[in-house]
Amino acid sequence: IFILYYCHKNKVSNLKFLDIVVVGLILAQAIGRWGNFFNQEAYGAITTKQELINMHIPQFIINGMYIDGNYYQPTFLYESILDLLGFVILFLIRCYPYLKIGFLTGLYLIWYGVTRFFVEGMRSDSLMLGPLKMAQVVSIMMIICGIYFCFIRNIKSKKFENLYQEGGIRHEV
């Protein structure tokens, strides 16, 4: 709601603003996933210590995944790594001069939606909605919105714009 207010007040396109923000947002999410590790929450299925060692998981993470007498899959780590990869992709293409407004937002929604869908499938402590976990339902909606912003909406738009060119988002001091 604040983003909508800010963009309206400063006469900035909501999607253009989001295209700039999502690059840092996915990096923040990659870092934020480590909070799940420190809080020992949002972990995966029970596993063995040897399986974690075979996956070349660092020892401090293996130790942290020992909860209530069992070892668990470090789903926070999988999601953090995938979010970092998503950050690299968004970071590399963000300055491509022929992006349509909303494309980066759509790509973020697709990447993060797919990542969350699969990682949630590995978690053992999720809220269920029928056969799917609630977060997976939200992920499907994110993917659908992302496809809309990346492809369907952009097919109609003929305008390309460099997000970081002079005259982009106004900064008032």
PLM segments and residue spans:
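A feature for loop-to-transmembrane-helix boundaries and adjacent hydrophobic helices
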Residues: 1-173
